[in-house]
Structure formats: C-alpha cells, structure tokens
C-alpha cells in the first residue's frame, strides 16, 4: 500500500506513508480529509522505512501544511547552475491548532527527508525517532554504450534552511530507538 491510516483510542490520528509515488498526493489528500473528519487535531505522520520517491509528491504533501511560496526543498547544483527552489503550493489548511509529530528512522530517505525536513524547519511538527538515512542526491542516467548507462549525481537536496540532507540526514528532536525486543514483541515505542 501507499499509506495506511488509523484513529487511535487516545484520539491521535496516525498516517503511515510508505512511499512517494505518482498516486501518493491524491491518497494523502484523502487521508487528510479522513483526519479532519475524525475531529482530532493530533496527527502522527509516520515515514519510518519510507525510501522516498517523487520530489513533486513531497512538495505537494508539504503544501497542505505550509503557506504558498514557503521553501520545501532546494536543489543545489554546487555552483554549476543556479539553485532551484521548490516551494509550497499553499493549500495550508491547518493553521496553529494542529499538533504534528513526524516519526523517522534510518529507513526514512530522499522524499521522506524532504517532507520531514520542511515541516520541521518551518516549525509545523517535531521529529521523533532515529536519525534518517541521508539520501539527498539528485541523480541522472547518462547513456554510455550498448544499452548501458551511468548514474551520475548532478545536485544535492537541501532543507529550507540550507542544510544538506546527504551530509547528515535529519536528527530527531526526540530520539526514540526501536529495539530488537520491541520488534519481536510487536511493540512500537
């Protein structure tokens, strides 16, 4: 699945996002509608183990939380060309009443880090879990010969504050690690 939702008995709505595919933004919008209709103002956005996907999906999802024009990510070409700023479309439907926690771990990579980093740096939500993977490179396939190609890094992703995702990943505000015992017993700390 692309995502799962659950309204817990304690009133917290959990949205688990597994990837950033072409259909993810529409499914995310429907999940947010479900969240609003639940009457809760507490949302857990779980991107643990999410390897990423399309940048456009991450920008669209961030747009539900950010005013128009706010930077979601910066594509930095290392001085070879002007940086490209990817900005919120400004759906911004939540305002100040939203209580958002974003769950991350070493399996949160690429578009997961872009979404989590943007929401964190714009003070929309706090990061909880483990340090993320650090996959912040933009790659392009260059044809070589005989049907082979070479994948070349052409740029790197930066958070809205200009921090390199590739260098450090994202460090959570609150570190919570999942132990082997937690996994074996089906517990989610």
Which stretches of residues belong to each language-model region?
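Conserved functional hotspot residues or short segments at active or partner-binding sites
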Residues: 161-189
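Cleft-lining beta-strand/loop regions that shape enzyme active-site pockets
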Residues: 1-145
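Short acidic, Pro/Gly- and aromatic-enriched capping/linker segments at domain boundaries
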Residues: 146-155
